Each structure stands twice: as structure tokens, then as C-alpha cells.
């Protein structure tokens, strides 16, 4: 389903990238006196911010449209969250901290809740 892919990319994957790379890793670069490297990613952060405004509106509208839509979105979100977290864990643990990926997961879950989703997650 194209909307499942839309949700996976724009909410889950981009959510992890934003939190881990453009928040946590960027902050680490600043603490290592590498602010000039962090500045190189400014365009990507701006682009993801613009995309987020649009994709959040689309997801929020789809979730509010019907109970069936909300149920599907919740199922897709819950299924993809664990896979994406597992994919980012090795890098996040090596580059940042052991709990970095958990912080990113919580940020993505909070964003999903703001969009009207109610993910049925064991650890949330």
C-alpha cells in the first residue's frame, strides 16, 4: 500500500533520522568543536522540516477521516517502528550512546500521538 510506505518513510524513518542525525549527532559535533560540519547539514534539516509540515498534515487528515484509517495507520506504525529501531540501533549505539535510539523512538511516538495515532506499543 502506498500510504503504508508514506507513513514508514515520512513519520518513522525520517523521525529517526531527524532525532539521531540532525539533533543528537549534530549536538555531539558542536561539543567536539565541529560546528562547521554541523552547518553542512542545515539544508537537509530545513528540507525535512518543510516536508514534515506537509506529511504531518496528510497523516493527521487520514487518521481523522475514519476509524478504519486510524486502525490501519496504528497497525502500520507499530509494525514498522520496531524494524526501523532495530535498523538504527547499531549505528546509534556506536556513534552516540546506548540510549540514543530509545530517545529517538520516544520522539517518534510522541509525534505520532500528536497526529492522532494511538500506537499500541508494549514499551510506551
What does each model-found stretch correspond to?
Residues 1-11:
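Acidic/His metal-coordination segments adjacent to aromatic residues that form catalytic metal sites
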Residues 82-124:
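C-terminal accessory extensions/subdomains outside the catalytic/core fold
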Amino acid at each position: 500500500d502506498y500510504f503504508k510506505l508514506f507513513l514508514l518513510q515520512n513519520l518513522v524513518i525520517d523521525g529517526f533520522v531527524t532525532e539521531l542525525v540532525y539533533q543528537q549527532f549534530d549536538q555531539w559535533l558542536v561539543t567536539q568543536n565541529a560546528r562547521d560540519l554541523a552547518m553542512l547539514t542545515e539544508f537537509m534539516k530545513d528540507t525535512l522540516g518543510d516536508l514534515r509540515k506537509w506529511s504531518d498534515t496528510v497523516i493527521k487528515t487520514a487518521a481523522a477521516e475514519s476509524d478504519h484509517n486510524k486502525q490501519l495507520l496504528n497497525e502500520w506504525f507499530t509494525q514498522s517502528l520496531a524494524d526501523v529501531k532495530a535498523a538504527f540501533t547499531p549505528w546509534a549505539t556506536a556513534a552516540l550512546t546506548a540510549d540514543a535510539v530509545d530517545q529517538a523512538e520516544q520522539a517518534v511516538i510522541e509525534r505520532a500521538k500528536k497526529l492522532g495515532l494511538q500506537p499500541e506499543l508494549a514499551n510506551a
